[in-house]
Amino acid sequence: MTAHDQELRRRAYEEVEKKEPIANSDPHRQHFHIMPPVGLLNDPNGVIYWKGSYHVFFQWQPFQTGHGAKFWGHYTTQDVVNWKREEIALAPSDWFDKNGCYSGSAVTKDDRLYLFYTGNVRDQDGNRETYQCLAVSDDGLSFEKKGVVARLPEGYTAHFRDPKVWEHEGTWYMVIGAQTENLKGQAVLFASDNLTEWRFLGPITGAGFNGLDDFGYMWECPDLFSLQGSDVLIVSPQGLEADGFRYQNVYQSGYFVGRLDYNKPELKHGEFTELDQGFDFYAPQTLEDDQGRRILFAWMAVPDQDEGSHPTIDCHWIHCMTLPRQLTLSGQKLIQQPLPELKAMRRNEKKIHINMHGSSGALPVEKPERTEILLEDIHTESGFSISIRGTATFSFHKDEGIVTLERKSFDGKRTEARHCRIKDLHTVHMFLDASSVEIFINNGEEVLSARYFPFPGNHEVTASATGKSEMNVGIWTLM
């Protein structure tokens, strides 16, 4: 570790010591989501299950609530409920990452943990340079940087980042999000026999592949894995135009299902499907744990989307992760469900049956800033709605076959909405934290995630219907 690296870490810890008490005094501070101690959190990085613990690294800017030269922060857990903050994993201290240790991934080999990340560099004229870098650890806590292992191939701009690494039949592969020189987004592949020397194989898909036309000017945060006999590519394309209810956020995150031919190499796949229908979801990354489960974490925000309006900025922090979600395939569709381990947080269970007929009433929610609500056995003539703390509303419009999530904008000046189409509604599973809501529809067929910032004194959660609606409701306080 260089003297400059030590100095950056010292300054970051000093910032935490100075500002974390202010951050923790914020009524919007989350109770059961990963968030930064201070400063800005964005993409989950290096998510991995290793030696009995889940590791989630994250993009972290400790000195401000705007983006800048990123560190890698680090949390671990053994039960996916109680998270421990570990020491800083990476600091932007070397010539190859001096403007940020950008996103990447983790793998294990010979009982060591290998972190791959993008070193972001600006030259003296402000021009971007990009390097794919490696750091290695014996204990999973302290990492030794090994420097650059892959450089920019011809035909691409320096928007070339976010390596995700895995092993297949004795060879290591790395997928990277890329932008071609003619400003088209692609996912490209490298291969290695030893994790330190990488050869460029070429693009596997992108704009102009598999029937895709112009499909964004940049693809970020690719993740490629096998699931139930198919290959799944998760990616966050930038530059998609809104299309009906689709692509409503500034940038998108979604997936393709298909088959990767490692010899060509080429990914043959179907259409792109968004992972989350809500307001705040980006840069997802997955791991496989010791039970063989494919688990996803994502950043509960979108770059360049109202970030400056978050009220938490006044308390020196911004952003959080989604809850971890287990992924399964149903045909060509990814199903996302909250991990069963989260049930360990449940306290004060209430089970009720509600029957509404052109009426409304408050649900017996004790702590709406830390609550789980499960609606089951739903029967409704025309639909119903759930209003959450006067700031967000979930509604089902049966005739149109649409579910809607509305919220007050962060500046409080307007109401915003996101919609998705469903054939029928059987279950609604809500997780309400101090400043977020995640809603799983029909056991994870669709998910809507959003940050929201209710008035701390408003604790009311109400259900209403214009026609006849009845359902069974489970409510838990989450501790």
Curated annotation (Swiss-Prot):
Gene3D superfamilies to which the protein is assigned, alphabetical: Exo-inulinase, domain 1, Glycosyl hydrolase domain, family 43
Region annotation Disordered: where it falls in the sequence: 1-28
Catalytic class of the enzyme: hydrolase
Pfam families cross-referenced by the UniProt entry: Glyco_hydro_32C, Glyco_hydro_32N
Reactions it catalyzes: Hydrolysis of terminal non-reducing beta-D-fructofuranoside residues in beta-D-fructofuranosides
BP GO annotations: sucrose metabolic process
Associated pathway: Glycan biosynthesis; sucrose metabolism
Gene Ontology CC: cytoplasm
GO MF term list: beta-fructofuranosidase activity
Top-level lineage group: Bacteria
Keywords linked to the UniProt accession: Carbohydrate metabolism, Glycosidase, Hydrolase
List of residues binding substrate: L40, L41, N42, D43, Q59, Y102, S103, R161, D162, E220
Record-annotated active site: D43
UniProt-listed Enzyme Commission number(s): 3.2.1.26
Keyword Hydrolase among UniProt keywords: yes
Induction: Induced by sucrose. Expression is regulated by the antiterminator SacT.
Family per record: Belongs to the glycosyl hydrolase 32 family.
PANTHER family: BETA-FRUCTOSIDASE
Annotated protein name in UniProt: Sucrose-6-phosphate hydrolase
Organism: Bacillus subtilis (strain 168)
Gene field: sacA
